[in-house]
Amino acid sequence: MLSAPPTVIIDVEASGFGRGSYPIEVGVALADGRTACFLIRPQSDWTHWDPTAAALHGISRDLLAAKGRDVREVAASLNELLAGSTAYTDAWGMDSSWVALLFERAGLPQRFRLDAVARLLNDEQKAVWADCKSLVRAEMCLSRHRASADALVIQQALERTGELRRTARRGSPLSAASPESP
């Protein structure tokens, strides 16, 4: 049986959590295997900065000032990459508000939809989701917590847990597929 094509995944790193936070990096993993990542230069009134979040993603204010792109450029690039598609996130509640803020500040309409990865998972997949993401991250030797790397991990974990829908339960659904001896 042919497997379903990979799903488009989006991930957002932010200045912190909650009120006053804003997007600082957006990463996508596309269905064709490409990834894209955009650092975002904060707007002048985006001053919230949570040291705990910064320690997690490792992005400094200095890096954003030096390498960050204007919100309009990032929003236009996302529209170009994702127009007409649905991009899935494993943190829909937060990521959707940060993407909405990005497009609001850019003054551009968002030309793609965001939806929750959880809507794609059945109960068996949900039960192994966190472990599968950890396993995929380890297998890919990704230690950094950055948007494009996280999007790729989510995409691969979704594909891996999708095997639960497509194959009989032989061995661990998280391990590499290998035929068992009768």
Regions found by a protein language model. Give the residues of each.
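Short His-Asn-centered micro-motif
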Residues: 10-12, 67-68, 89-92
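Metal-dependent phosphoesterase core characteristic of DEDDh/y 3'-5' exonuclease domains
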Residues: 4-6, 19-24, 30-59, 79-182
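Short acidic, Gly/Ser-rich segments with clustered Asp/Glu that frequently serve as metal-coordination loops
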Residues: 12-20
